[in-house]
Amino acid sequence: MFQKTDFLSKIFSSSSHPLTGSQNIVVKDPQTLDFAMQSQNEIVCSLRERSHMNTMSYAQTQMMAIDEIRAFQSEGHLHLKYISLIIAMMAETAVVTSRSWFPYFSCPSKSQRLAEAEGRILSALGIKYLARLIQIPFKNTEISTITVNCESEQPIVKAKYPIVLIHGFGAGVALWGSAIKRLAQFQTVHAFDLPGFGRSSRPKFSSDPETAETEMIDSIEQWRDKMNLEKMNLVGHSFGGYLATSYALKYPKRVENLILADPWGFNEMDPEFAQKLTSRQKNIFWVIQQFNPLAVLRLVGGYGPSLVRRLRPDLALKYSEDVYDYIYLANSRDPTGEEVFKCLSENLGWAKQPMSKRFHELDNTVPVTFIHGERSWIDWRTTRRLFGELEHVESHIMDSAGHHVYADDADKFVQLVIGSLKDGKTGELVPEEVNLEEEIVTPI
């Protein structure tokens, strides 16, 4: 049995931090101390049961976490419930890196629950779809894919090539929601879970940023080949937009149109942002960056859906209640996709290799459309200033949307997507005056 003194005694053992001189952590609230001891004990025991982690590896993890806690701890006070969480998250990151436990998601019933939650979300929206696993050569990875065929007898404009959707960080195919239904009025739609996310396999990617990015986009190309798609109208959201752009840079002949929905990773970090940070804030941010982004969601276990509901109560307005189970279950597996994102990012989510430095290399025969949410945390103003004047680039701002443009206003989003696609017969753009709200009446 893991004893609470194994780490608490280390926290209180010395009078000051060897580097910072910070005094011992003082806890005046007995309830906070009891909570910390109990929660830390439960979390670590759970980790040990699942991972069979060796003592030395975990001891090193403890000391690293404790050192960092002391480094940014100020005025001698820090709630131990946060210490418990930090140590547990650091432990998860350490054992995932060494792959001493696998898989996170060993229970078949949970895998089935994820598939069922996905099905209920899509069915509640009246979407008829084909679900399948497409195996690609990269480490025999299986890519979870759904296809929605165009069933409209007389679509307003029939796009020449299928529409392919690439989701963002921590998401999956089901979150495209009603946008899939509307897009399928014009062309067959394929949506897939990126490797390392959703229901797809969890292959181990390289820890080198350039190699990891290449592995991810080559996986997309292998998926396209297995799907027998000559070209694609490629739509990527957030992190998916970053990967879609990277894919188009390497495989421009396979992209008919590139539509970027509030893409992540385009702008360089604002130097003024870093300059404004205090030393304490920099230390805190450094600690946070050592964790897998969604580690806390896994650490809370069965409370995951409730945590998602508390953080995003608005999701119930766009999807069925199953969305909370879906997000939790989709991110309960070995987080290899998260590790790729973590590998490609720095300084709290800025891309190490921002697309602003590479976008000029994109073949200018590939039409690009940016669709941003006015209320998004993404800096769309800089993106628009950098690329808005290029002849092959269009930029749209949805004043009714935040970061999740496809869900915040699905009708407007689809109108902009379809308006950017070339007519397969004439090569002309779909007229902007097409009113999708009036035209889309046939349920799928």
Curated annotation (Swiss-Prot):
Expressed in the hypodermis and intestine. GO terms for molecular function: carboxylic ester hydrolase activity; lysophosphatidic acid acyltransferase activity. It comes from the Eukaryota. GO terms for biological process: lipid catabolic process; lipid homeostasis; phosphatidic acid biosynthetic process. GO terms for cellular component: lipid droplet; mitochondrion. InterPro entries: AB_hydrolase_1, AB_hydrolase_fold. Residues 162-409 form the AB hydrolase-1 domain. It is found in: Lipid droplet. The keyword Nucleus does not apply. Disruption phenotype: Increased survival of dauer larvae and reduced lipase activity in a daf-2 constitutive dauer phase mutant background. Keywords: Hydrolase, Lipid degradation, Lipid droplet, Lipid metabolism. Belongs to the peptidase S33 family. ABHD4/ABHD5 subfamily. Acts coordinately with phospholipase atgl-1 within the lipolytic cascade to distribute stored energy to tissues to maintain energy levels during the dauer phase. Localizes atgl-1 to lipid droplets, possibly to facilitate triglyceride hydrolysis. Regulates lipid droplet size, lipid content, the exchange of lipids between lipid droplets and fusion of lipid droplets during the dauer phase. Interacts with atgl-1; the interaction tethers atgl-1 to lipid droplets. This is Abhydrolase domain-containing protein abhd-5.2. It comes from Caenorhabditis elegans.
